[in-house]
Amino acid sequence: MGMKALLPSLLGASAALLFTASFAHAAPPIPDSLKTGGFEVGCQAWTFHDFTLFEAIEKTAEVGAPTIEFIPNQKLSPEEPTVQFSHNSPKEVWDKVKAKLAEKHVTPVAYGVVGFSKDEAEARKIFEFAKYFGLQTINTEAVDAIDTFEPLVKEYDIKVGFHDHPKRPDHPEYRMWDPEYILSVVKDRDPRIGSCADTGHWVRSGLKPVDCIRILKGHIVSSHMKDLNVPLPSGHDVPWGQGVSDVKGILDEYKAQGFEGPISIEYEYNWGKNVPDAKLCMDFRRAYGK
């Protein structure tokens, strides 16, 4: 075969290799066993932050959610209320948590919102913690540490999502609420660095979640899902589908973009007695998938 005839084959092979290489570090697909209504949905432990982590795991199982997102520094258990759980805890504490998760058939998938140090050794502790528990995503607001943790994202193949809290009129320098700002931070970074889309905080900031999700298309790596009673900073959580956040529209847009999770139910109302409300959120998700 002459060089002219061979050239298209070589170019095709090179393109195939490049295509393969571009997906070489893609996160593995979410197991069907962790999906509800086509999405991976679980509870954010903050929903039960008035309780210990062991109790939060029990309540997550009671809700019928297969997954949980850890928060840093939650008290471990009723038996050990002075022990805190985080990436800085000794391994024996991690082992106890892993055993409790197995007992309740709950899978940890994310951790946050957690701060990142610019010190590589300190940042690595968070990734080692995530690796131990098999987490998919770490959620943070530490934009200033992105140069520190981006190499660790590549090394560990673990995603990092930038979380948004509401707009702060008294702190105009806070920009995490703005999806355009988040996009500017992540668009030229490793694709495993993206947005942890908190839909409720967007509503509290006067934004429509579906519009925000479209702005961040292809750059959402996790989500904290909320439906609020009113589109105001004072708005509080209601079961999905009963508020103003357009949860169906959010799920439709996630589905259109191919985003399957992790999605965390973060219910910040009826503290101490919100398991029934969280169950209704799971029911909405199941009905959506039918």
Question: Each predicted region: which residue ranges?
Answer:
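N-terminal secretory signal peptides that target proteins for export/translocation
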Residues: M1-L6
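Bacterial N-terminal signal peptides
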Residues: S9-S22
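Histidine-acidic metal/acid-base catalytic patches
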Residues: H25-A45, H49-T67, L183-A197, V203-K290
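Active-site acidic/histidine proton-transfer and metal-coordination neighborhood
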Residues: H25-P28, W94-D95, K100-A197, V203-L207, ...
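Active-site-adjacent substrate/metal-binding segments within catalytic domains
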Residues: E69-E79, P108-V109, V113-S117
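Glycine-rich, proline-tolerant flexible connector loops at the mouths of alpha/beta enzymes
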Residues: F70-K96
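A short acidic, helix-capping loop that chelates divalent metal ions and anchors anionic groups
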Residues: L76-V83, R168-P172, R204, P231-H236
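Alpha-helix N-cap and loop-to-helix initiation/capping positions
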Residues: Q84-V93, K118, K125, E173-Y181, ...
